[in-house]
Amino acid sequence: MKHRLISYFTATFLAATLISSMTLHAAPYAAVVMDARNGKIYHSRNADTRLHPASLTKMMTLYVAFQAIENNEISLDSYVTISRNAAAEPPSKIWLKRGQKIKLRYLIRAAAIKSANDAATAIGEAISGSEANFSKRMTRTARAMGMSRTTFKNAHGLTRAGHLSTARDMTILGRHMIYDYPQYYNL
């Protein structure tokens, strides 16, 4: 009985220690609730805390793609050749192969619906020549729309040093997506 009790308390202590250490490293809750029609904010918490945006990054990837399409830099029917870099991205992905050719419209769908990292990288490389150049363009676009605390380092959102945004900045981007390029909703 004594041995069972000691085992129970040891297991409980280890679990509590593990959970508390995980909690110490958890990102803070951050949110902004805005009426996109008028910009009125109804809820805000840690709105300007810089956090990793994860797959929300793909909103900017698509925004820049739509911008490039509108500027006649590329078309929805342009064939994109998949690079070794894009094909090597970790999941979530659609398992694109190096050298494969696929229309931009299908890469956009894969990035938007499947959150495909390989598709997002291929989009960036097709538009700007490299992931690094595309990331710089994403950051410039963010600044131009008032996203002052956002820096992009890739097109897909996987964690990378310096790849950060805020809830407020993502709200700004979401609003721009809704109003600047509604013609691409049913792509």
What are these regions (language model features)?
Residues M1-T12:
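Bacterial N-terminal signal peptides that target proteins for export
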Residues Y184-L187:
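A penicillin-recognizing enzyme superfamily signal
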Residues T10-S21:
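Bacterial N-terminal signal peptides
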Residues M22-R168, R175-P182:
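Active-site-adjacent loops and short helices of periplasmic peptidoglycan-processing enzymes
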